[in-house]
Amino acid sequence: MASLYLLLLLPLFLALILAATITESKSFSTTVKAPYPGHKPDKLTHLHFYFHDIVSGDKPTSVQVANGPTTNSSATGFGLVAVVDDKLTVGPEITSEEVGRAQGMYASADQNKLGLLMAFNLVFTKGKFSDSTVAMYGRNPVLSKVREMPIIGGTGAFRFGRGYALAKTLVFNITSGDAVVEYNVYIWH
């Protein structure tokens, strides 16, 4: 009879221990107060500018820093890595007013189609967004008419920023490799 009570009480005892363990363990996530008082990410900002990628001449703004063993024989340049500090301007001409720089890197990361992995900080140097940055990271299928890449963060006015960037190539010089790309960036911050 005692063993019957033991068999009936054992599952109850184990359930109580399990319940106590669950309530004592740390949670994976918690809701916290905003670290910056008054910050409410409810503003949508549209930025429009032109990106000048210069790989030719005496002062290139995009420099190849690495390649793989098959980069030169690959139709997509797979393995190429470049570091950039490209000018961002108000108009499509390189002489138009500079509003910032695109600083970061891109890598040819697709063996079958021309696709770049882009990791950029858009650093703004003029206007109300001066000293603010936007972090853009994603895939750029450069032969598509319009490409979409995610905005994953920012600093300054764009702290806690999120959104997307639309890129459209205006000019690509097949001989020099230089390009002008129009960007429309939408950021919630």
UniProtKB/Swiss-Prot annotation:
Provide the leader sequence positions.
1-19
- Answer yes or no on keyword Membrane: no
**Disulfide pattern:** none
An annotated GO BP: phenylpropanoid biosynthetic process
Q: Where in the cell is it found?
A: Secreted
Q: Would the keyword Secreted turn up in this protein's UniProt record?
A: yes
What InterPro entries does the entry give? Allene_oxi_cyc_Dirigent, Dirigent
Mind telling me which GO cellular component terms the entry cites? extracellular region
Q: Which residues are glycosylated?
A: N72, N173
Chief localisation class: secreted
Q: What Pfam families does the annotation carry?
A: Dirigent
Q: Which UniProt keywords are present, listed alphabetically? A: Glycoprotein, Secreted, Signal
Q: How does it assemble?
A: Homodimer.
Family to which the UniProt record says this protein belongs: Belongs to the plant dirigent protein family.
Q: What does this protein do?
A: Dirigent proteins impart stereoselectivity on the phenoxy radical-coupling reaction, yielding optically active lignans from two molecules of coniferyl alcohol in the biosynthesis of lignans, flavonolignans, and alkaloids and thus plays a central role in plant secondary metabolism.
Query: Under what name is this protein listed?
Result: Dirigent protein 21
